[in-house]
Amino acid sequence: WVADELIANGVCDACMIGRPNLCDSEFANKAKAGKIDEIRPCIGCGRCLTGIMFGKPISCTVNPAVEKEEIDEAPVKKKVLVVGGGPAGMEAAYVAKKRGHEVVLCEQSDRLGGQLNIACVPIGKQEITKVVKYMKSQLTGVDVRLNTTVTKEMIENEFKDYEIITTVGATPKEIEPYK
């Protein structure tokens, strides 16, 4: 963290942190406790500033639940299948697990992250790798299955008692309707 380095090197005595507090409302508490790896990373995209500047609701590219961080336990525990291991799939799996559900996350490729793995390649975009790393770290207790394409047969057999969340879509594909 830049603030950490500035204070450690005697450049300043304190730093004001703005956008990262929107990205992770527990930023200060986690930093104070030394839990730096648990902080949801801000990528400095400025999306939050758009809402502030134009009097609109604040939103965050990295934290879809900004200003709504409390996750209540589900009144009824369910089995949940999340199809797709991109950012939406990882967030859906995290929230479902946090609510107390039994969660399986299936990703057809050999790694999680989806299009974020490509988005972090251009010069100046390496911060995005921190988002993927953070999101992966939040999947403790989730049954993550890589190299797994969910088929109709799997849904009819192994996952017949599951609620299904489909989070695919960055690569257009024809999907056969399920009846």
Residue ranges of predicted features:
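C-terminal structured "cap/appendage" subdomains that terminate the fold
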Residues: D4-A14, E26, Q126, K136, ...
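Short low-complexity, flexible loop/linker segments enriched in glycine and/or proline
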Residues: L6-N9, N29-K32, I118-P122, Q126, ...
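General beta-strand structural signal in soluble alpha/beta enzymes
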Residues: I17, L146, T166-T167
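Phosphate-coordination loops involved in phosphoryl transfer and adenosine-cofactor binding
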Residues: V76-V80, N147, D161
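Beta1-alpha1 glycine-rich phosphate/pyrophosphate-binding loop at the start
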Residues: L81-L146, K179
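A conserved short coil-to-beta-strand element within the FAD-binding core of flavoproteins
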Residues: L146-E158
